[in-house]
Amino acid sequence: MSASPGCGRAAVALPWLGVLARVALLPVTACAGETDARGWLERMRNAATSGNYQGTMVFSAGGSMSSTRVWHYCVGDQTFERLEAQDGRHQRVFRHNEEVRTVWPQDRVAVVEKREPLAGWGTTPQQVEPSALENYELRAEGSARVAGRDAAVFLLEPRDGLRFAQRLWADRGTGLMLRADVLGPAPAGASRPVLETAAFSEIEIGVRPQPEAVLQAIRRIDAAAARLDAQETARSGSARAEPPGRSGPAASLRAPGRPEASSALRAEPAPADERAEVWHVVRPPQRRADLEAEGWTLRQQVPGFRLAGCVVRGIESAGQPVSVLQAVFSDGLTHVSLFVEPYRSDRHRSEMQAQFGAAHTVMRRLGEHWVTVIGDVPAATLKLFADALERRR
């Protein structure tokens, strides 16, 4: 399961989306050891990118469990998704291609984003990784049943110690992946531990696509954002006429589970209309970037990984707007995200390392910057990224 750009493990359904994206990235032309297994990869990729299905996904890791309701539709080359958390804080995500709207109904907060096509988000592959099966060996492991459906089982065995093995269950009728386990190293004489699991507990495949349900939600959120823009413009005009020392309405809000918002992130209060679902809209700024152009490079490449994309995101830290650089590296199956932000002694204290399920995190100071590396790989792999990163200017 890949680290989602800008989001933590609590982000709704992203672990499962990352699994589908990884399967979609797997090449079918590389030697997988079995012609039939290569054919299954083709089927899994097609089902993940062009199938219509809805169901409930359960994600378990680190002794905790969460579930998400998933609706996925494809119409031509257009992809539509709706995700709704079934546990904890109520959260909904609506996606049309790269346009993403995240809503916290109980807080009346919406985040409006256009997600860059970095690895690890969505179920549509952005490119094929021809070297993926240079890092993993694909093995067929028989049959099983998942969510009441017959499934073929496959193991992706890493060729080195820099990544984890993964076991996949694919629907025999359509090829859609029904379950994915990330497996830890096997202790001597014991079976491999399951670090985390994402699986459908129930699913309907081949449903009638309903893209309008997603588009209506996006239009409703965008209409609320447009109203807020108009009100902000009116307030700005009236504020110029006010005597010095008067202050207008607060223009910042911390969105639950998201970076703090500020005027730089365009978070504005909406009118107190009880019928409105959204009272606040946050637009985190984001732009594509080039790692070397931003002044960073890896002294040496981590074997099997290549740079898949790079963005700069705006967040608020301790009341101040901060730019965070994110670089995503892929080995064709899993991803590592590397974040760089300005170092602050009041926020960044000692170097640390953490684990939740298969996800490991390494954080450390590098000169005047703070580096965070996250991925579903062993901690030693993340340390290779952190050790190789250097400032060129």
Language model features by range: what are they?
Residues 1-13:
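N-terminal secretory signal peptides that target proteins for export/translocation
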Residues 235, 239, 243-367, 377-380:
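Short, solvent-exposed recognition patches
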Residues 178-181, 368-376:
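Short, well-ordered beta-strand elements
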Residues 143-228, 355:
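Gly/Pro-enriched, hydrophobic low-complexity segments
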Residues 31-106, 134-145, 149-153, 157-185:
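N-terminal mature ectodomain segment of secretory-pathway/periplasmic proteins
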